[in-house]
């Protein structure tokens, strides 16, 4: 069965998207599911740090999109869980380096090898958000009790429902 793509998003930064993505990924991989995380936050990646993989990055998502690396070369295997992998975002690239169609292609290329593809979305509702939801089968919206965070989460729900 091909992987399910789940995007973890919110409208506001700092509500716990990256931590939630990492925790769900570890929980799924600990049960034996094959999991790959895609950091969709180009220019501001953090998922590699949260997962303890920041020193193992050779290639990133933009390298794959621009043809400098194959998808398999960008996959970083977790040190503790053999079924957990990461494809990091580029740290120093323009957010426009990846398009929604690029994300769909990458996810489709990964579907046969994994049970779950988790996409850590950047904050906001611009290009990075559109990229992150493009291939999603499911979306998890993370928020906290701040009025602005709940309002932004509601806006994200409306945008997703309109897709």
Please place each PLM-identified region on the residue numbering.
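P-loop/Walker-type NTP enzyme "switch/lid" segment
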Residues: 37-112
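Flexible glycine-/small-residue-rich
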Residues: 10, 39, 88-91, 121, ...
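Walker A/P-loop phosphate-binding motif and the immediately C-terminal alpha-helix
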Residues: 2-41, 110
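Residues at the starts of beta-strands that form the adenosine-phosphate
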Residues: 34, 83, 138
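Conserved NTP-handling cores and scaffolds of large molecular machines
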Residues: 28, 32, 42, 54, ...
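Glycine-/small-residue-rich active-site loops that bind phosphorylated ligands and cofactors
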Residues: 13, 94-95, 124, 148
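Conserved catalytic-core segment of NTP-binding enzymes
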Residues: 101, 105, 109-112, 116-163
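Residue-level recognition of oxygen-bearing side chains
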Residues: 20, 70, 124
């Amino acid at each position: 069965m091909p992987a399910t793509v789940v995007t973890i998003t919110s409208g506001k930064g700092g509500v716990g998207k990256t931590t939630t993505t990492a925790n769900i990924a570890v929980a799924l991989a600990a049960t034996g599911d094959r999991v790959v995380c895609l950091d969709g936050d180009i220019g501001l990646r953090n998922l590699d740090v949260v997962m303890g993989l920041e020193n193992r990055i050779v290639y990133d998502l933009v390298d794959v999109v621009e043809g400098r690396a194959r998808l398999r070369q960008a996959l970083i295997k977790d040190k503790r869980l053999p079924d957990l992998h990461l494809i990091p975002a580029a740290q120093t690239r323009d957010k426009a380096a990846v398009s929604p169609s690029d994300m769909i292609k990458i996810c489709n290329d990964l579907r046969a090898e994994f049970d779950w593809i988790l996409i850590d979305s950047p904050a906001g509702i611009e290009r990075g958000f559109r990229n992150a939801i493009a291939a999603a089968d499911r979306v998890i919206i993370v928020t906290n009790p701040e009025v602005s965070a709940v309002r932004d989460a509601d806006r994200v729900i409306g945008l997703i429902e309109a897709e």
